[in-house]
């Protein structure tokens, strides 16, 4: 299933998902710095593995995916399948609604 078929995302619900499943490793605010994972500010339109000051796996750099709604929707289903060799240990969000909500939140919070 593609992002086009996804339910409309709810950024408020996405914020809750981010806080419970993502915030232990990622920040979204400009200049917030990196944690175990990279800061996600400016995520949309950026190429994977290119955030300055973060040590990415070769897999992330070599994948050279452009992050957007479609790529994030697929990636967040199963990160290790989408980018084999990624350092991200998160197993993914199986529910289309959860992925759509998280993407809606990320669009607002990382812009």
UniProtKB/Swiss-Prot annotation:
Residue positions where N6,N6,N6-trimethyllysine is found in the record: 80, 94
Posttranslational mods: Binds 1 heme c group covalently per subunit.
Binding annotation for heme c: 22, 25-26, 88
GO cellular component entries: mitochondrial intermembrane space
Task performed by this protein: Electron carrier protein. The oxidized form of the cytochrome c heme group can accept an electron from the heme group of the cytochrome c1 subunit of cytochrome reductase. Cytochrome c then transfers this electron to the cytochrome oxidase complex, the final protein carrier in the mitochondrial electron-transport chain.
Top-level taxon in the UniProt lineage: Eukaryota
UniProt xrefs under Pfam families: Cytochrom_C
Gene Ontology MF annotations: electron transfer activity; heme binding; metal ion binding
Record's protein name: Cytochrome c
Positions carrying N-acetylalanine: 1
UniProt entry keywords in alphabetical sequence: Acetylation, Electron transport, Heme, Iron, Metal-binding, Methylation, Mitochondrion, Respiratory chain, Transport
Record InterPro entries: Cyt_c-like_dom, Cyt_c-like_dom_sf, Cyt_c_1A/1B
Places the protein is found: Mitochondrion intermembrane space
Family note: Belongs to the cytochrome c family.
């Amino acid at each position: 299933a593609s992002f086009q078929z996804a339910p409309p995302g709810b950024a408020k619900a996405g914020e809750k998902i981010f806080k419970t499943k993502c915030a232990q490793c990622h920040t979204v605010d400009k200049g917030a710095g990196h944690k175990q994972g990279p800061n996600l500010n400016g995520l949309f339109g950026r190429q994977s593995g290119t955030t300055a000051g973060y040590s990415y796996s070769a897999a992330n750099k070599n994948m050279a995916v452009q992050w957007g709604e479609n790529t994030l929707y697929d990636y967040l289903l199963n990160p290790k399948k989408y980018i084999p060799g990624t350092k991200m240990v998160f197993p993914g969000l199986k529910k289309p609604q959860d992925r759509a909500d998280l993407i809606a939140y990320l669009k607002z919070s990382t812009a």
